[in-house]
């Protein structure tokens, strides 16, 4: 189609195709391009269904010295801020001291009866075991490490004992231990990374800054 000057207007189909290409390019810079299989099995779930939510992503382990504290705090954060748009995601990983050596089907019973125990059940999204470093790293974690090369609270964090490194290649942006944290904004863009030394609840102020204010009458 052209106007009186002879200039050609783009067809509607061309505009739609251009917009779709722009969306696809944006997806590659966000977590929405990735999927993961729930710990209970079934088909992989696209993280695109979490569009508009603030995400806290952690690599977790059920036999770590921090397991009780971090799992409990992850539950607490989800309870406090879930209604306002926070979604906590946990990815079991056995790359650090072999502290997640159970099969996928054994992890939930272990959490319930051993650590944290006392009937504990995660109220956040837990996915199947994966690797977070090396050639077989889950694509989501490869993306997160590239986007956020070092924890903001400890830029020098590295695996303390080289004998514990059980993956290849080794990269400067590798996750150093269980319970590192990646905060992702509501647009799917990684915002901040935290070391395993940073407790989960310590991230709450940064999460609050990304969430809408509580509705009147809301109580945590």
From Swiss-Prot:
Physiological role: May protect the virus and component of infected cells from oxidative damage by peroxides whose formation may be stimulated by infection.
GO terms for biological process, alphabetical: glutathione metabolic process; hydrogen peroxide catabolic process; response to hydrogen peroxide; response to selenium ion
Matches recorded under Pfam families: GSHPx
Record PTM text: During periods of oxidative stress, Sec-64 may react with a superoxide radical, irreversibly lose hydroselenide and be converted to dehydroalanine.
Catalytic activity: 2 glutathione + H2O2 = glutathione disulfide + 2 H2O
Family: Belongs to the glutathione peroxidase family.
InterPro entries per record: Glutathione_peroxidase (IPR000889), GPX_AS (IPR029759), GPX_CS (IPR029760), Thioredoxin-like_sf (IPR036249)
Site feature Subject to oxidation and hydroselenide loss to dehydroalanine, where: 64
Example GO molecular function: glutathione peroxidase activity
Note, other: This enzyme has been acquitted by lateral transfer from its human host and has retained 74% identity with cellular GPX1.
EC numbers on record: 1.11.1.9
The protein's name: Glutathione peroxidase
Alphabetical list of PANTHER family matching this protein: GLUTATHIONE PEROXIDASE, GLUTATHIONE PEROXIDASE 1
UniProt keywords, alphabetically: Oxidoreductase, Peroxidase, Selenocysteine
Gene3D superfamilies from the UniProt entry: Glutaredoxin
Active site, renumbered: 64
Tagged with keyword Oxidoreductase: yes
